């Protein structure tokens, strides 16, 4: 669920997903193609896309159980799909925090899709 993912990102980075991550680089936001631009785009967004891609048949909009306690994001018990999607989102939010030092606000925020050329990377 995008609202839950945004809360995870905000908790880990202090930044709202929109505008900071939804249109960042070539893989943050919907879909992606070309070469990832930096660690945030590659390690976080591209890997998140791959994580979701492995979950065919799982609805990405469903609300999943999770908690924010003692500074940690914990995915709760739910359906198999809910648990897996939560783990994808949790890993990406943590990745964003771990790669804040490479986040390029002036170079890749609102990066135009037209500059993402070439085939999509393989997971």
Swiss-Prot record:
Q: Please state how the activity of this protein depends on pH.
A: Optimum pH is 8.
UniProt keyword annotation of Hydrolase present: yes
Q: Where does Ca(2+) bind?
A: 27, 29, 31, 49
EC annotation?
A: 3.1.1.4
**Family note:** Belongs to the phospholipase A2 family. Group II subfamily. D49 sub-subfamily.
Task: List the source organism.
Answer: Bothrocophias hyoprora
Cellular compartments annotated: Secreted
Q: What cofactor does this chain's UniProt record say it requires? A: Ca(2+)
What SUPFAM superfamilies does this protein map onto? Phospholipase A2, PLA2 (SSF48619)
Keywords from the UniProt entry:
Calcium, Disulfide bond, Hydrolase, Metal-binding, Myotoxin, Secreted, Toxin
- What is its biological role? Snake venom phospholipase A2 (PLA2) that induces myotoxicity and local edema in mice. In addition, it causes neuromuscular blockade in avian neuromuscular preparations with a significant direct action on skeletal muscle function. Myotoxic action is exerted by both enzymatic and non-enzymatic mechanisms. PLA2 catalyzes the calcium-dependent hydrolysis of the 2-acyl groups in 3-sn-phosphoglycerides.
Q: Calcium among the record's keywords?
A: yes
The record's section on SMART domains has: PA2c
Q: How does it assemble?
A: Monomer.
Question: What is the name attached to this protein's record?
Answer: Basic myotoxic phospholipase A2 PhTX-II
Q: Which GO terms describe its molecular function?
A: calcium ion binding; calcium-dependent phospholipase A2 activity; phospholipid binding; toxin activity
């Amino acid at each position: 669920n995008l609202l839950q993912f945004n809360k995870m990102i905000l908790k880990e980075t202090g930044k709202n997903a929109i505008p900071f991550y939804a249109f960042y680089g070539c893989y943050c936001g919907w879909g992606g193609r070309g070469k990832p631009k930096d660690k945030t785009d590659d390690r976080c967004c591209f890997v998140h896309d791959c994580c979701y891609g492995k979950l065919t048949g799982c609805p990405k909009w469903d609300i999943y159980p999770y908690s924010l306690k003692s500074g940690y994001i914990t995915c709760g018990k739910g359906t198999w799909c809910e648990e897996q999607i939560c783990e994808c989102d949790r890993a990406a939010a943590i990745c964003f925090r771990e790669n804040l030092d490479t986040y390029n606000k002036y170079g890749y925020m609102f990066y135009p899709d037209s500059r993402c050329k070439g085939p999509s990377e393989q997971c």
